Amino acid sequence: MALNVVILAAGKGTRMRSDLPKVLHPIAHKSMVQHVIDTAHSIGSNAIQLVYGYGADKLKSALGEQQLNWMLQAEQLGTGHAVAQAIPNIDDNDTVLILYGDVPLIQASTLEALLAARPDNGVAILTVNLSNPTGYGRIVREQGKVVGIVEQKDANAEQLAINEINTGIMAVPGKALKTWLGRLSNNNAQGEYYLTDIIAMAHADGVEINTAQPQSAIEVEGANNRVQLAQLERAYQAREAEKLMIAGANLRDPSRIDIRGEVTVGMDVMVDVNVIFEGKVVIGNNVSIGAGAILIDCEIADNAEIKPYSIIEGAKLGVAASAGPFARLRPGAELMQDAHIGNFVEMKKAVLGVGSKAGHLAYLGDAQIGAGVNIGAGTITCNYDGANKHLTVIEDNVFVGSDTQLVAPVTIGKGATLGAGSTITRDVGEDELVITRVKQKHLTGWQRPVKIKK
């Protein structure tokens, strides 16, 4: 049977107090509904039906050109009515998995367990036991078998005492789902078409109903307001931090780290507090990352060090390279083995060769820098002429004095020395010494101006 996923994402989310549709509010810089979509893809979904309503334009803009079937729910008449909008894209032989766009922490392993629990031609529902089940639909059993789900507002005193609750997530055979949805009624306390009513129909039809449970109740928590959104964010971060520690990272304080993408770590990685990871970050063995650093879409090789408050974006650090504190590597920057940049050095589309150093206060853009090069404080590669970018090439073992400007395009030959305060506008040959600053003058008897008293 093909797996067909229906994601309900039509709600406005009034309690969010926002113009943004509820499901677009982010967890770890990714919308809640995108988390759900990604999880659906990860379990091998053949098709995803996204049932939408409020904020259609914003939803379509945010989710882009993904492989989704957009199914409009013009009126919000209940969960059963929402799922019914997807019927045109459901085949009789499909296994239909129903998910929710505001339940972002559901794990692939939980959904796989749910699908495995579904009997042939039967139903599987995801349930959880809560000490305080108030507000949730209760799982009604007779002699241990599920016979129905009753919503909070429709439950009697005996049913309200039940601790096993419905998460709303279920796996249903396509043909039966179509039949049951067609038989739904809105004759209930809320005047809605409850999806949960199909469970009683399944029981009445003699269909076997199994249950599965998540590893943690937080997986099935939704977010209806910003407080709950923040709680889900913290839960997500705790889960991701745990993965890093299991993989070999030592987190100084696991509660003070933000992971907003896919992070891969080697062994004995040290991560100080308030570090942010975004996008795809790959970190080797024995890497040290200082407090307040931000790593975005970057690769860090073994034994490298990122000192506090440095920003590494779209860049690479080679073996035993170091950056910071307060350094910035922008897209296309690369530090080769044993290379170092210090505080307030910025690089973009530039390579700093093996063992080369730029200790402080420099801008290196559109530059190819060889091995064993020293970049003095205040050095700037003047790479932009107002219209186009140009390349600076600094070959091996060059010494660049402090406060030097290199006006690109320009090449500095091997072993050359550039005197402090020079402005280099022409190529420099190998082993040459170049000084372009004006001759120093000594004016004796000169008096400094004084303020005129008024």
Curated annotation (Swiss-Prot):
Single GO MF annotation: UDP-N-acetylglucosamine diphosphorylase activity
Enzyme Commission identifier(s): 2.7.7.23, 2.3.1.157
Reaction(s) catalysed by this chain's protein: alpha-D-glucosamine 1-phosphate + acetyl-CoA = N-acetyl-alpha-D-glucosamine 1-phosphate + CoA + H(+); N-acetyl-alpha-D-glucosamine 1-phosphate + UTP + H(+) = UDP-N-acetyl-alpha-D-glucosamine + diphosphate
Region (Pyrophosphorylase): 1-226
Location(s) in or outside the cell: Cytoplasm
PROSITE patterns documented for this protein: HEXAPEP_TRANSFERASES
Pathway(s) this gene product operates in, as recorded in its UniProt entry: Nucleotide-sugar biosynthesis; UDP-N-acetyl-alpha-D-glucosamine biosynthesis; N-acetyl-alpha-D-glucosamine 1-phosphate from alpha-D-glucosamine 6-phosphate (route II): step 2/2; Nucleotide-sugar biosynthesis; UDP-N-acetyl-alpha-D-glucosamine biosynthesis; UDP-N-acetyl-alpha-D-glucosamine from N-acetyl-alpha-D-glucosamine 1-phosphate: step 1/1; Bacterial outer membrane biogenesis; LPS lipid A biosynthesis
UniProt: acetyl-CoA binding residues: 377, 383-384, 402, 420, 437
GO biological process, one term: cell wall organization
InterPro entries to which the protein is assigned, alphabetical: Bifunctional_GlmU (IPR005882), GlmU-like (IPR050065), GlmU_C_LbH (IPR038009), Hexapep (IPR001451), Hexapep_transf_CS (IPR018357), MobA-like_NTP_Trfase (IPR025877), Nucleotide-diphossugar_trans (IPR029044), Trimer_LpxA-like_sf (IPR011004)
Cofactor notes: Binds 1 Mg(2+) ion per subunit.
Positions with a binding annotation for UDP-N-acetyl-alpha-D-glucosamine: 8-11, 22, 73, 78-79, 100-102, 137, 151, 166, 224, 330, 348, 363, 374
KW Nucleotidyltransferase (keyword) present: yes
Chain residue ranges for the region called N-acetyltransferase: 248-454
Top-level taxon in the UniProt lineage: Bacteria
Keyword line: Acyltransferase, Cell shape, Cell wall biogenesis/degradation, Cytoplasm, Magnesium, Metal-binding, Multifunctional enzyme, Nucleotidyltransferase, Peptidoglycan synthesis, Repeat, Transferase
Residues involved in Mg(2+) binding: 102, 224
Function: Catalyzes the last two sequential reactions in the de novo biosynthetic pathway for UDP-N-acetylglucosamine (UDP-GlcNAc). The C-terminal domain catalyzes the transfer of acetyl group from acetyl coenzyme A to glucosamine-1-phosphate (GlcN-1-P) to produce N-acetylglucosamine-1-phosphate (GlcNAc-1-P), which is converted into UDP-GlcNAc by the transfer of uridine 5-monophosphate (from uridine 5-triphosphate), a reaction catalyzed by the N-terminal domain.
Family (UniProt): In the N-terminal section; belongs to the N-acetylglucosamine-1-phosphate uridyltransferase family.
Quaternary context: Homotrimer.
Record-given protein name: Bifunctional protein GlmU
Organism encoding this protein: Shewanella sp. (strain ANA-3)
